[in-house]
Amino acid sequence: MAKTPSSRAAVEHRERLGTRMAGIASDLWNIASKTRSVSIVSSPPGAGKTTTLVAICVHALATGKRIGVACQTNAQADDVCRRLKAVIKPQRICRFVSGTNAAPPPFVGCPVEKSALNVAGGPVVVVGTAMKWALIESAPPINLCIVDEAWQMAMATFLPLLRFCDRFILIGDPGQIPPVVSAPTQRWETSRNPPHRAAPEVLRARLPVHEASLPATWRLPFDTASLIQDFYDFPFESASLEGERSVTFDKVSSKGTPVVDAALDRLNRHSIARVLVPMPTAGGLAQSDPDVAAAAAETVVRALARNAKATAKDRGIELKKLEPGNIGVAASHRVMVQSVLSKLPSDLRGLVKVDTAERWQGLERELMVVVHPLSSMENPGEFDLETGRLCVMASRHQSGLVVVGRDHIGDTLDGILPSATQPLGRPDAVSRGLRQHRAFWSHLDKGEQSG
């Protein structure tokens, strides 16, 4: 096991990060309070985006301002309201809902309004989905609009916000899955203002924006921060130090597949392990790949059979026994999700969350089992090389990650020659994705070689 840092060093490390985060929130408000501006805040996974948002709201309310918060989903909006309640009087928080939304308020005492005209006067934080804000015809003045999970918002969804505010702070994770647009987008690919692209990407290219980035991931263990660093164009670290997070397992008499047990044992020393399934000697690979699905399911079953226990010294957790609800499985395709579910014992289905990368966004578990997106792909296409899904899946764990896949992935990545078919003037997303995939796989290779 890695050497555990002294408690003093660990405390000072996290105090330093907390001070930096507080300074970033203060600076963002100072910029927004002085002039019309757009600030873009890039965040690694689990870096305190909502904490930063709440801190900015506190600064703004203290000076009598009105803030609008545009979230991407109702669940995100409710979560923001609950987080605000911890530091702001409930009457200064308003949950903005659609006319057909019959959901209860996110907490007792939180005003819920269907019309912007009914929102109370004076300092207030109005929280709603971006789609709800887009439908507003008129509203009382908003001094600052904060966009939560901004890289999930298409530029077309951002534009209506300009009708009632001229100061914006966009906070989000640029490694996440790009906005989902159902309409054909080919005609906009060469546009200077592509409406289907993530709003921060377009604004950054067209306007003088203030840039900031959150300094650390508070969710991910020390060595996972370096694993996913290549998905981002800004540096960050982990709030946990080397040796503070681990998952340990009992030695039991029942026998499991050696490669699965070896991967689990590795989590006592590192936060990342890998289970490789040999390529079949004959025939091709199916998207449902029952062998890989079985390996992913067995990893979950063996972790529970061997009484998995998580330690996170930075969070005050010592040998917490993991229940089925503390373990998750992620895959990039629904077909593989169903295949894994079919291999799980019936008593674990519904207790262990098994879902696609899209549905894992914003969630976390102590231990994650991830089916590598290229595992069943012998000839990956552009969709397969897009790294948002891999980044999401590889950043949901708090203590341990097991990547499951076929053993051809490294050779497949080495054999890909990008075709550079991107539209004129657009970045070569395929080559970028290929570089990131190779860096990710190389990191796993080096980790295993280091023991």
Where are the model-predicted features located?
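ASCE P-loop NTPase helicase motor core
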Residues: 16, 31, 38-105, 129-238, ...
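Short, conserved catalytic or adaptor-binding loops enriched in Gly and charged residues
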Residues: 87, 115-120, 199-207, 263-270, ...
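Conserved helicase C-terminal RecA-like lobe
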Residues: 305-330, 335-395, 399, 404-413, ...
